């Protein structure tokens, strides 16, 4: 049995992976939390960069968390997450033979994808995965989304 839980913590970090931001936007669009026309999509993704400012990421999370149907994001993310949306690490995680190897790899390299946070794996009566986020904006929604990303 794997138990997923989180603890709150704060750390200063300035950028996040563009691929994670893109995956989040796609899930939000699929959940009908955000609607984009073709021109907006082109602006968002036409000039893709490797990293996105944490300020931009925080603004997106605030917008999503304030939506009356914010809970729909977690389900949409689980349904539509594709390893390709998480860049090279996503491909590496998808190629792992089991969840144990994936978590081990993720513990080492997850900061390259998202907005930080620490993953800790411990074993008592079962396995326990602790995710300690390094941010304050929309914590609950972000933690749920990250944990869905890990187990999806």
Predicted regions span which residues?
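N-terminal low-complexity or simple alpha-helical regulatory segments
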Residues: 1-128, 142, 149
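A short interface-forming secondary-structure element
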Residues: 130-141
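Oxidoreductase and adenylate-handling cofactor-binding alpha/beta cores
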Residues: 152
């Amino acid at each position: 049995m794997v138990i997923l839980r989180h603890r709150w913590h704060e750390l200063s970090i300035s950028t996040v992976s563009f691929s994670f931001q893109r995956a989040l936007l796609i899930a939000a669009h699929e959940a009908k939390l955000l609607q984009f026309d073709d021109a907006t999509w082109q602006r968002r993704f036409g000039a893709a960069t490797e990293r996105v400012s944490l300020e931009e990421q925080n603004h997106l999370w605030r917008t999503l968390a304030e939506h009356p149907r914010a809970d729909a994001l977690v389900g949409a993310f689980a349904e539509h997450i594709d390893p390709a949306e998480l860049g090279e690490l996503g491909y590496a995680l998808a190629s792992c033979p089991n969840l144990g190897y994936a978590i081990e790899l993720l513990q080492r390299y997850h900061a390259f994808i998202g907005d930080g946070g620490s993953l800790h794996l411990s074993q008592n009566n079962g396995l326990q995965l602790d995710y300690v986020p390094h941010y304050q904006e929309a914590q609950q929604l972000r933690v749920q989304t990250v944990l869905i990303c890990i187990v999806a």
